[in-house]
Amino acid sequence: MALTLGTKKKVCYYYDGDVGNYYYGQGHPMKPHRIRMTHNLLLNYGLYRKMEIFRPHKASAEDMTKYHSDDYIKFLRSIRPDNMSEYSKQMQRFNVGEDCPVFDGLFEFCQLSAGGSVASAVKLNKQQTDISVNWSGGLHHAKKSEASGFCYVNDIVLAILELLKYHQRVVYIDIDIHHGDGVEEAFYTTDRVMTVSFHKYGEYFPGTGDLRDIGAGKGKYYAVNYALRDGIDDESYEAIFKPVMSKVMEMFQPSAVVLQCGADSLSGDRLGCFNLTIKGHAKCVEFIKTFNLPLLMLGGGGYTIRNVARCWTYETAVALDSEIPNELPYNDYFEYFGPDFKLHISPSNMTNQNTNEYLEKIKQRLFENLRMLPHAPGVQMQAVAEDSIHDDSGEEDEDDPDKRISIRSSDKRIACDEEFSDSEDEGEGGRKNVANFKKVKRVKTEEEKEGEDKKDVKEEEKAKDEKTDSKRVKEETKSV
């Protein structure tokens, strides 16, 4: 893996072991189990030693209504497979039922996804990390009052709203094969967020993302859409991504970046029609890292789950500036990766319908739009008091050397590059059979959820402190 030499970044990684238990239903292409596979693979590559691992706080309904409508979130909290008949009109109104089915633990799944992304943004705001990773996030199709494209709560919008408390300008980059419509819609009329999406366009879900969709009002020219055809390969993708993102960075001058790393743009994806390899996909991560800005990396689409796990493991390694071998280590889901048991995939022989002339024409049109931007728009920032969330740094010094350290403390420790000893816990964990999904329990009462949250969340992410912080910055959020 060829990486640019330089100062290594501090990386924080958010993961909840329960996320793999949620199940959209038989035959549904969205499989949260892919997040567990990714986690297990990067553990067995030893990447956990080089980053801080956190279990995210579950986002509350109040957190979600920073963007989503109250009645929509109330509906998501209430709906269950056993009471769907009572909500038939609301299911139709909120677009829940087919692509976005009702399943056991739906709201808790949304809480984990959104909680990880918002917590990642808080970490970046507090300058406690350079890169924050939440592969459970990136659900870019969800709208203010509507589920869409397997997405219910738009964790990306919630995370960007959090970043805007401390950053004047945030750029959102989407390399999922599908247009990032939900995020674009949320920020379509503001000049504080630029949305940049590289996606398949033309008789393809969600049908938006035309080159001519450029934003409106104050947000005019702050939406960038690179509409692509079938079969784009690594070489063509790199040839458009780097110049477009260089121009965006030059003209917009963001102080934070959100990168949605949807893996359905890979070759061989169950729902995709692009021809990128994992290395080609990861070149986007490598390039964005070179701008040395606070970076939030999120998941997204990806429906050939063995390749999703490969991709996001490799991109975690890229974030860490770590070289990992192509030979996959043995892991709990090793049989999924046969017959080759390698990390990297080969492109197919599909035709690249994106001619050089077509790509150049689109690129020049986008450059014309970007030239219409005023350089680095100004914004009046309100002073925000220091967060009251506690910092856990220094905890290691308080450990009793005669006692075994907790899993939580162990996760927070980052090993030096020269440290090769194996953890005594290495190799423990998950199941091998994806078919044996554990059914999660009913949606719990508010009192039960609050009790669980207090146990699960790290000191720095307690619900009490987050609520205090959200009230203090409410006016700033509303102004976006």
UniProtKB/Swiss-Prot annotation:
Active site: H141
Compositionally biased region (Basic and acidic residues): 401-416, 443-480
Gene Ontology CC entries for this record: cytoplasm; NuRD complex
GO MF annotation terms: histone deacetylase activity; histone deacetylase activity, hydrolytic mechanism; histone decrotonylase activity; protein lysine deacetylase activity
SUPFAM superfamilies tied to this protein: Arginase/deacetylase
Annotated compartments: Nucleus; Cytoplasm
Keyword Phosphoprotein part of the UniProt annotation: no
One GO-annotated biological process of the protein: heterochromatin formation
Catalytic activity: N(6)-acetyl-L-lysyl-[histone] + H2O = L-lysyl-[histone] + acetate; N(6)-acetyl-L-lysyl-[protein] + H2O = L-lysyl-[protein] + acetate; N(6)-(2E)-butenoyl-L-lysyl-[protein] + H2O = (2E)-2-butenoate + L-lysyl-[protein]
Free-text function comment from the UniProt entry: Histone deacetylase that catalyzes the deacetylation of lysine residues on the N-terminal part of the core histones (H2A, H2B, H3 and H4). Histone deacetylation gives a tag for epigenetic repression and plays an important role in transcriptional regulation, cell cycle progression and developmental events. Histone deacetylases act via the formation of large multiprotein complexes. Also functions as deacetylase for non-histone proteins.
Official protein name in the record: Probable histone deacetylase 1-A
Species of the source: Xenopus laevis (African clawed frog)
Designated gene of the protein: hdac1-a
